């Protein structure tokens, strides 16, 4: 299934990757790789991850304290937010 992104997702990812880049370039690459793999898993099987709110699903990264929310459309999934687990849990739920 195709993946589309909310316009602010790129900013979310850059912000998260920058934190890891400051620690280690390799760690930033590993974060990016895990995020891409997890998004691919969601695209392959959109119902794989549990519901979050009324219209989203939440996929947690395994090695990093981040998740992304996505919604399922007939022909694609749309990633709405990439966020840290400690950020407000409803952050991004109002993105459309």
Walk through the language-model features, giving the residues of each.
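Arg/Lys-rich, positively charged N-terminal/basic patches that mediate binding to nucleic acids
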Residues: 1-32
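GIY-YIG nuclease signature motif recognition
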Residues: 9, 35, 70
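Conserved amphipathic alpha-helical interaction elements at protein-protein interfaces in regulatory
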Residues: 15, 19-22, 41-44, 76
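Hydrophobic pocket/interface hotspot
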Residues: 16, 35, 79
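Short, flexible helix/strand-to-coil boundary loops that buttress conserved ligand/catalytic motifs
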Residues: 17, 46, 53, 81-83, ...
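A short, surface-exposed loop/turn module that caps and links secondary-structure elements
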Residues: 37-62, 89
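Enriched for short, Lys/Arg-rich terminal
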Residues: 67, 71-96
């Amino acid at each position: 299934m195709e993946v589309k992104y909310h316009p602010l997702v790129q900013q979310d990812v850059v912000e998260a990757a920058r934190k890891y880049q400051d620690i280690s370039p390799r760690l930033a690459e590993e974060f990016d790789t895990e995020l891409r793999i997890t998004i691919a898993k969601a695209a392959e099987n959109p119902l794989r991850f549990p519901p979050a709110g009324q219209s989203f699903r939440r996929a947690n990264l395994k090695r990093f304290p981040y998740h992304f929310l996505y919604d399922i459309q007939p022909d694609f999934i749309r990633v709405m937010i990439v966020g840290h687990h400690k950020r407000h849990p409803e952050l991004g739920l109002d993105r459309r």
